[in-house]
């Protein structure tokens, strides 16, 4: 039986961000500076991606008050739920090259729903190595128990992922 091959997502060259709009039209952008992720090449030729975002470190650059809100119990509630996780269902490598959808389980605040990341077509022949794999996925925060601030913040949170893989060392 063939084993899966694992590739680590490169934390130095990758970025996991998000944006949410206020009811007044302002866009708030944040990111997760600490994360772990991997791409698995499955024995049947499909791929699967998994990542864990450290929500305790979520940041809205230059906006300390917004950063505190995002970490607080009304949003990510990092004291109780320090990690945001995504595990895709298996998909073909063509999705990353040509663009398409990657669906999987997203867990925020201990609540899991199936969500979809929309991958843009690659700008190179070795996506993840020679160019970023770029995907976006929009979720409704209310589905994850983040119902506070409805008068000020929209319900849609868009995750923007720009990923690179670590190169295997060559002998």
Predicted regions and their residues:
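Low-complexity, acidic/polar, glycine-enriched regions of mature
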Residues: 1-171
């Amino acid at each position: 039986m063939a084993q899966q091959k694992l590739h680590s997502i490169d934390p130095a060259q990758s970025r996991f961000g998000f944006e949410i709009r206020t009811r007044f039209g302002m866009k708030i952008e944040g990111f997760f500076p600490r994360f772990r992720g991997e791409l698995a090449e499955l024995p049947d030729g499909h791929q699967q991606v998994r990542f864990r975002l450290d929500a305790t470190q979520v940041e809205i650059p230059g906006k300390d008050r917004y950063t505190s809100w995002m970490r607080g119990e009304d949003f990510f509630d990092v004291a109780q739920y320090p990690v945001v996780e995504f595990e895709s269902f298996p998909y073909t490598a063509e999705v990353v090259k040509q663009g398409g959808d990657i669906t999987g389980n997203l867990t925020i605040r201990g609540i899991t729903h199936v969500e979809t990341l929309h991958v843009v077509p690659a700008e190179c022949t070795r996506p993840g190595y020679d160019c970023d794999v770029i995907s976006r996925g929009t979720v409704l925060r209310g589905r994850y128990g983040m119902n506070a601030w409805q008068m000020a913040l929209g319900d849609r949170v868009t995750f923007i992922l720009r990923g690179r893989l670590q190169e295997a060392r060559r002998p």
